């Protein structure tokens, strides 16, 4: 996964957290004792989980030490783990959870065909695997990033599949399977705010791909110019 900057990501905390709130609200389980938040970032999603299930024992997991540090500082009462999601899913641990939750993280993790069944094994019978992945890779702002980057730019791959892929993968092992798509429209004040939004998410892998600060500055300048 790309490395993340918690301060940059949280510049738009309310907007970034809304899909997480909606996902948590769709999980109909009431008696939830244990939850793990995969790809918890700076803990904004973990806070939503705590509000949804206030009596639960909550664990946040992320492979970014800086994100976990920020999450632990903001919410020291929960358990925090620095670990890669694939490694966690492949670990033969017997620890299971009432809810395995992941908001806007698994699109950075490869091999969903093997990953999702492994994650599902960590859910207790009668529990829930609740996951949200963005599906806006073909939005104009995202397409523009790829147009500006040279073909030689090595950018971390985005992993997302059509809805029927996930249905076929999970239906036989699920008592109930809900799949839906929501489009979130964020009204931002100006072009600069749009660029700041994407610097905390979609632009991050592109900016990491450049070797020099000069290249990053040039890329951002061209992106800002063309997104107007």
Describe each model-derived feature in a short phrase.
Residues 4-5, 173, 177-228:
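C-terminal helical/coil "lid" or tail adjacent to the Rossmann-like core of SAM-dependent
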């Amino acid at each position: 996964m790309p490395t993340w900057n918690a301060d940059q990501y949280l510049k738009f905390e309310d907007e970034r957290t809304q899909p997480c709130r909606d996902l948590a609200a769709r999980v109909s389980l009431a008696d939830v004792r244990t939850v793990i938040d995969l790809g918890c970032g700076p803990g904004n999603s973990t806070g939503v989980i705590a509000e949804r299930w206030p009596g639960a024992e909550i664990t946040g997991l992320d492979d970014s030490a800086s994100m976990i540090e920020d999450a632990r500082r903001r919410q020291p009462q929960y358990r925090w783990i620095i670990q890669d999601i694939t490694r966690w899913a492949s670990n033969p641990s017997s620890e299971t959870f009432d809810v395995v939750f992941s908001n806007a993280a698994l699109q950075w993790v490869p091999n969903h065909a093997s990953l999702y069944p492994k994650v599902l094994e960590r859910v207790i019978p009668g529990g829930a695997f609740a996951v949200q992945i963005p599906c806006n890779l073909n939005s104009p702002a995202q397409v523009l990033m790829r147009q500006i980057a040279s073909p030689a730019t090595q950018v971390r791959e985005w992993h997302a599949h059509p809805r029927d892929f996930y249905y076929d993968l999970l239906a036989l092992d699920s008592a109930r399977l809900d799949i839906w798509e929501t489009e979130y429209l964020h009204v931002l004040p100006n072009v600069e705010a749009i660029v700041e939004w994407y610097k905390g998410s979609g632009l991050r892998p592109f900016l990491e791909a450049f070797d020099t600060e000069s290249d990053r500055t040039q890329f951002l300048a061209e992106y800002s110019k063309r997104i107007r």
